[in-house]
Amino acid sequence: MKRFLNLIVYILTIHVSALLIAGLFRLVLFISSYHQLTSEALSDKTLPMLAFVHGVWFDNVIGCYILLLPLVVAVVCGVCNYYGKALFRFFTIFFSVFYGLVYLISASDIPYFAYFFKHINSSIFEWFGYAGTTAGMILGESAYYLSIGLFLLFLAGFVVWLIYLARYFHHRSLTISAPFPYWKRGGAVLIGACLIGLCIFGIRGRTGYNPIKVSAAYFCQDAFLNQLGVSPTFNLLTSVMDDMRPENKYLHLMDEQEAITKAQALLNRPGDANVSPLAVYRHAAKADSVQQRRPNVVLIMMESMSAKFMKHFGQSETLTPFLDSLYTRSISFRNFYSAGIHTNHGLYATLYSFPAMMKRNLMKGSVIPRYSGLPTVLKENGYYNLFFMTHEGQYDNMNAFFRTNGYDEVFSQEDYPADKVVNSFGVQDDFLYDYAIPVLNQRAATGQPFFATLLSISNHPPYVIPPFFHPKTSEPEMQIVEYADWALRQFFEEARKQPWFDNTIFVLEGDHGKLVGDAECELPESYNHIPLMIYSSRIQPEEKTAFGGQVDIQPTILGLLNIDYLQNNFGVDLLKEERPCMFYTADNMVVGRNDTLLYLYNYETQQELTYDIGNGKLNAVPMDDSFLPLKEYSFSMLQSAEFLVKHGKTLNSIP
């Protein structure tokens, strides 16, 4: 047993040593990019320390991947009572090769980060097709010599250390002469199993619902420190895995240039050669300002809130008395549709005015994309932005994505008491709303306008109805809607007591819908038909019947606020413009609809489904020219969005 424990100590010593060297690379990155630190980070020395702690966390994940096979080999050799020189030679070569790769990536990341301000990712493989040019670039730039030298120095030092450790621990194993009966071999198996289990847990990285993602490293408002904690190797591997996902393959609906030309005409966008083909400057009409003091904005995204749950849209049960009453007191929209059928689609489209791209989660990835949108424009105009979610911050990469794209603070399950967590999606709606009120009071007290986004969750399985709430219906799917509506009422009643209420615009929408009633076609309307209400005590109520979608919320709200900005997205101001139709997606389905026609296109099977809408009911009809405007409208918007994302033209400024 002593020889086995000697072997385990040897392997763990290598693991710790490797993490220390990875930390040295991080220290070099920190020093080389020190000038990127904000004044807040410079004044608070604990922030860099926390970034390094996150770095150890991420480095350990990669280390555990490497450690897993040696642990298995160690257990097998321990059971067989083999501790020969060949075993230690194997470990020396194995760790030298794999950590050599890790250190090569870390060294390469230093100049890469300095140039791109992001960690090395799968895009580097595009350079492999130009091997000569790439080699010339690396060898011809003297600034890269430091990274090359550090790599060679640290790797050489690590290999020498491995050789020393192998000799030392092998010699120790020879000096240990103890019998190794079968019961002790069983003990070795037990210890080894525990260590392997811990190693697998280390690979997962955390105890929460989701394994560790890049988002876990984001903890403050300093963009550099948020990225400092991410392991370059972790970032590279996960970005490669992201690229391999089928849903991330490039979308081909029509010719790119044709799509852009059509989108420019349909949206009346002249484009800006320095920004994007769809960029346009929006100049506010100052005389139409809602009020002298810039209003706060509270956006509430209601989980799975299909319009079909509301009496106003034909629901027979009284499920949403508060929303139905608010609908008549707001600027409300009768024909409003979600961009997709998942929460990430709704957030992405609502906040940044880009359409959902089929199944793809455009927020989720190790390489955090940058977008201009409602949060960034408001931030540029003096707003303080807050995001409140019920679940873990790294779910759908939300923490990292939103901190990168305009939000100052993100509140998530990690901030709430553990006893308030009711399921894998965190806390319930009423707790989220109660938690937000004092936070918003603190922000309002500063005199700075705020933009707060609250993402509810209760209307998502598994449904958890609080014991204190007594619904009137009998089915859980309906009871939870009653509860969600009740929680909203409680939030508004509490918010109405606050001094900031009258100077706040409230925007309420479903993040997407769900199946309500029977399916009338391949894609039931209830999945995407959602309510949108814009409420303020100083806004005249009105119902809009023109078509609109989540991509339109940003320009509509900025129009209400009378803010000048450069628009580079797919939204229209629904208070000043009208769409002839609306487009949206649902996983593999592209949809275009107007008052009389419905066009569905299955991207995977390339099947077209066409319906006539007569008296609110669908009648299947053959495809003909009358559906072409819907097809061209939908395809051109989606293909143009794919072009802008592919080429990084998602900001409202010159890159």
How does the language model describe each region?
Residues 2-249:
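Transmembrane and membrane-interface helices of multi-pass
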Residues 21, 121, 131-132, 230-234, ...:
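Alpha-helix initiation and N-capping motif
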Residues 30, 86, 111-113, 165, ...:
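Charged, low-complexity, helix-prone segments enriched in Lys/Glu/Asp/Gln
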Residues 55, 59, 137, 164, ...:
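Residues that form generic nucleotide/phosphate-binding pockets
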Residues 85-86, 247-258, 363-367, 571-572:
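Short alpha-helical "patches" and their helix-cap loops
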Residues 125, 129-130, 231, 245-246, ...:
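Short coil/turn linker and secondary-structure boundary residues
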Residues 130, 218, 222, 229-234, ...:
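The feature marks either
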Residues 268-655:
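Solvent-exposed soluble domains appended to multi-pass membrane proteins
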